[in-house]
Amino acid sequence: LLKYDSVFRAFNHKVVAGKDHLKIDGKIIPVFTQTDPALIPWKSAKVDVVVESTGRFTKLADAQKHLVSGAKKVVISAPSDEAPTFLMGVNHTTCKKSDTVVNNASCTTNSVAPVAQILAESIGVKKAMMTTIHSVTAEQNLVDGLPPKGHPDLRRARSALVNMIPTSTGAA
């Protein structure tokens, strides 16, 4: 996935995969396969900020496990009911140094919130409705079939490539 990409094509650098690292142009980058964030050695890897984008650790207590293992800050790249939300261009200046775990909301929220804020401040907004068209995600089926395991939304069983699939969103 790093050396060859459907969109960006070939990565024009020498990439060698090791058991616990990637070597890119001679620089070693550690790779971890740990499923428990508390056991990932962030401190010894000298990682200050973890971008939590697995979608599995959106609850504050779960994301804080990265702090236990040595990270100084965690940014959850999905909506979280428990971690404070900060959006660039909207309220990012209110983030305090003491905020160790924050969330950056959903990709949909990030695309609509700055525009909505400008409209609200300039002409006011009484009501609004938003529609989003999202690219295919990893959990969607490429052909019609069963929905992803444990997913209650049967619309997720539809082929992502040939259907417009109305579905839920984490957008605020």
Predicted regions and their residues:
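Long, contiguous binding/interaction regions
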Residues: 148-161, 165, 169-172
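N-terminal Rossmann-like NAD(P) cofactor-binding subdomain of oxidoreductases
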Residues: 1-142, 146-157
